[in-house]
Amino acid sequence: APSYPRYTREEVGRHRSPEERVWVTHGTDVFDVTDFVELHPGGPDKILLAAGGALEPFWALYAVHGEPHVLELLQQYKVGELSPDEAPAAPDAQDPFAGDPPRHPGLRVNSQKPFNAEPPAELLAERFLTPNELFFTRNHLPVPAVEPSSYRLRVDGPGGRTLSLSLAELRSRFPKHEVTATLQCAGNRRSEMSRVRPVKGLPWDIGAISTARWGGASLRDVLLHAGFPEELQGGEHVCFEGLDADPGGAPYGASIPYGRALSPAADVLLAYEMNGTELPRDHRFPVRVVVPGVVGARSVKWLRRVAVSPDESPSRWQQNDYKGFSPCVDWDTVDYRTAPAIQELPVQSAVTQPRPGAAVPPGELTVKGYAWSGGGREVVRVDVSLDGGRTWKVARLMGDKAPPGRAWAWALWELTVPVEAGTELEIVCKAVDSSYNVQPDSVAPIWNLRGVLSTAWHR
């Protein structure tokens, strides 16, 4: 057997582009796949996601990579082996984030501590259901460590009564409901707003949105079991608290109107499953709220308490965050009391392929993307322009058919068009929902200092 040189992971990580040679690892072997990049059946953009790192997390997304002939093909490109003394660094016991779970290396990280990341655009619209490991992650605080056997969900009932449920009781006492729903962060596409004027918040690209099949108990069933009535006459809210807390002990919290929480058509879940498996730690194991059609900030994670209040949640994330303002409001004049908390989100769409600046061969080009609207409103059309909005074509929509008012999941869309050599394309998309809401054509009129609700035509 030939003798191969040894490399550290740091050395492998320096090889991330064709100019520097594209290296990857599989097991303890190192491969130079530069000459295979353009031959990759999934396209060069997919294999380059693993450049400088391990293939396994990406191969796990597609079963074909487990075939023997794929491994045989890879062996042709072997150039070395990982140094045997390579080992992961020990966690820092003083770091409050030291107990956070491992993450998929393909995620585009916007903040390491707390961890906030989105899937690469190239993979975002590849599947209707987002793989758990690529689902966008929005954490405000360290990920709590929860022992399933000791977990209790507290529901503060009427008259001072309290319902305490273990994970097993939540599973056994209430029928399991399943809902396919898209969750989107209020700051999705914030980076586009920051190009107009600076904003405060994480620089999300188009990936702070993902879709999963959620399973769990109906919030309505649990609240009725706790003794609450079907309707209340005031402006009550159902408030949620998570197990994630700041250094002062204040938990993440949010709330939704009582009518939505109790509506059988709103499909609000206390979810314990995600795409057929238990919730991953980053996605709120063991229980999270899923509020379909509503901004992701209200789908509280690592749920510990549910209560009914005459007012909205007092949490700062409900009162002093996730609100939209006029472009004329700045940090000297902003008053969070004057704006309602975001609940249902406006219609949204984005192009996921091709990526900006990509060179495409002449012939046929398939443009892909996603579209979604809040409040259960179905996306009825996506218009795509190749010339900056001067002329338009209608894309083909793909997705699940849902009852009126309960279109909780996104639509994926694509459009195949002829492209001549030497043509420069300015691809634009805009979506229309069942209420004929349509995206605004530019960012400037909807700019706001927090960079939320960024829904202009995607260019």
Curated annotation (Swiss-Prot):
Keyword match Metal-binding: yes
rRNA-binding listed as a keyword: no
GO cellular component terms, A-Z: mitochondrial intermembrane space; mitochondrion
GO molecular function: heme binding; molybdenum ion binding; molybdopterin cofactor binding; sulfite oxidase activity
GO biological process, one term: sulfur compound metabolic process
Location(s), subcellular: Mitochondrion intermembrane space
Region (Disordered): 83-115
Cofactor dependency: heme b; Mo-molybdopterin
Chief place of localization: mitochondrion
The protein, known as: Sulfite oxidase
Organism: Gallus gallus
Gene assigned in the entry: SUOX
